[in-house]
């Protein structure tokens, strides 16, 4: 055997041993020390508040949109957005359990599913926002405001593609997250943690780069281009309007204003998503860099608060939507509850506005 082959054969076990003994990022597992109860109580208060607001807001938004008699493609996509938010916050109870127990005691199945569900719902959210922006741009460019949108079968196919692609794209996280023993700083002995163990570092790099590109940057670019085109068309149409318009033209102004309100709301949802999801994307990339620079320190507590900030996006989405587009519906609900007579008047007068629904297809 040549010296080179012997050296390579001797280095292989060393590399395997080094990979096995490498300290892995513990994600939500953390040894808090003397202030464990106080820190866990603060974390619980924050996440419970986010969970309650998000659950109430998304359920109310789902009900309000589902009650509309005319539900086009945009309405179906908005409903899909709220469903993705509800799926995302379903991970909060598991996160809180780990923050209290410090070690991972939930078993391997929960370890495989936790980050898979979180990544799946995030991917569905950004792809849904991109689909909404494209649908709105196509309708406005081709002047299809009053034309019937895609049928139920086309909407079902679109939603199936969004969920199917997101499920496949996030599948490696379901496979490679596993429970392993590791000694954390401040711990007297090894504890179980749920961590990501890729077979090879090049595989991890390729997946991270491709996922961020295809599921974050490309949909973001689609959204920016679509809304830029919509804004350009909106500004051009407003310049062509004059004060001395006929009744039919003033009717078109009202529709245009409602389209602009929808555009503004969806644009705010897109901006809030990128602001509140960018920190977790950056943190995941830093965890990848940690494989090459062991001196790069990322605290599990920092990761938790970054994830909590991302969870807050699920609470913000229905708030932005309800405040911007559903003020009249909420006013009608409150009036029906506190002032039945006034609520009945609002209900009767609102029937005539249903044909000008802000969620169109």
Curated annotation (Swiss-Prot):
MF (Gene Ontology): arrestin family protein binding; fatty acid binding; G protein-coupled receptor activity; taste receptor activity
Effect of residue 99 to A: Impairs LCFA-induced intracellular calcium release
GO cellular component: ciliary basal body; ciliary membrane; cilium; endocytic vesicle; endosome membrane; intracellular membrane-bounded organelle; lysosomal membrane; plasma membrane
Carbohydrate-modified residues: 21
UniProt cross-references to Pfam families, sorted A to Z: 7tm_1
Keyword Chaperone assigned: no
UniProt topological domain (Extracellular) ranges: 1-45, 99-112, 178-204, 290-295
Modified residues (Phosphothreonine): 347, 349
Keyword Glycoprotein: yes
Transmembrane segments: 46-66, 78-98, 113-133, 157-177, 205-225, 269-289, 296-316
Post-translational modification as stated in the protein's UniProt record: Phosphorylated at two clusters of Ser and Thr residues located in the intracellular C-terminus, a prerequisite for FFAR4 internalization via an ARRB2-dependent pathway.
Residue positions, PTM Phosphoserine: 350, 357, 360
Tissue: Abundant expression in the intestinal tract. Expressed in colonic intraepithelial neuroendocrine cells.
InterPro entries in UniProt: GPCR_Rhodpsn, GPCR_Rhodpsn_7TM
Intervals, Cytoplasmic compartment: 67-77, 134-156, 226-268, 317-361
Family recorded in the similarity comment: Belongs to the G-protein coupled receptor 1 family.
Name the record gives this protein: Free fatty acid receptor 4
Organism this protein belongs to: Homo sapiens
Phylogenetic classification of the source organism: Eukaryota, Metazoa, Chordata, Craniata, Vertebrata
Gene, per the UniProt record: FFAR4
């Amino acid at each position: 055997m040549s010296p080179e082959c012997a050296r390579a054969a001797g280095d292989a076990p060393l590399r395997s041993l080094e990979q096995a003994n490498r300290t892995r990022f513990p994600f939500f597992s953390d040894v808090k020390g003397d202030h464990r109860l106080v820190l866990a109580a603060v974390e619980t208060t924050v996440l419970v508040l986010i969970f309650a607001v998000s659950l109430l807001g998304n359920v109310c938004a789902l009900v309000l949109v589902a009650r509309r008699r005319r539900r086009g493609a945009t309405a179906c996509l908005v409903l899909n957005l709220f469903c993705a938010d509800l799926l995302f916050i379903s991970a909060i109870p598991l996160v809180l359990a780990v923050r209290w127990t410090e070690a991972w005691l939930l078993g391997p199945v929960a370890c495989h599913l936790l980050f898979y569900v979180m990544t799946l719902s995030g991917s569905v959210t950004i792809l849904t926002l991109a689909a909404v922006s494209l649908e709105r741009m196509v309708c406005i460019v081709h002047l299809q405001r009053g034309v019937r949108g895609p049928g139920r079968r086309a909407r079902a196919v679109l939603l199936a593609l969004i969920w199917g692609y997101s499920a496949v794209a996030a599948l490696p996280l379901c496979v490679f997250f596993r429970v392993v023993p590791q000694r954390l700083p401040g711990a007297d002995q090894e504890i179980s943690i749920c961590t990501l163990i890729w077979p090879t570092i090049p595989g991890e790099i390729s997946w991270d780069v491709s996922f961020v590109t295809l599921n974050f940057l490309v949909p973001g670019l689609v959204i920016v281009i679509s809304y830029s085109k919509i804004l350009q068309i909106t500004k051009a149409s407003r310049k062509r309007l004059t004060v001395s318009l006929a009744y039919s033209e003033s009717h078109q102004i009202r529709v245009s204003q409602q389209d602009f309100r929808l555009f503004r709301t969806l644009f705010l949802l897109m901006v809030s998503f990128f602001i509140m999801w960018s920190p977790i994307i950056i943190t995941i990339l830093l965890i990848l860099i940690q494989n090459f620079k062991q001196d790069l320190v990322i605290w599990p507590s920092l990761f938790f608060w970054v994830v909590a900030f991302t969870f807050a996006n699920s609470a913000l989405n229905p708030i932005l939507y309800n405040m911007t587009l559903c003020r009249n519906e909420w006013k009608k609900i409150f009036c029906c509850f506190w002032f039945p007579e006034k609520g009945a008047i609002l209900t009767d007068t609102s029937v005539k506005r249903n044909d000008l629904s802000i969620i169109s297809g």
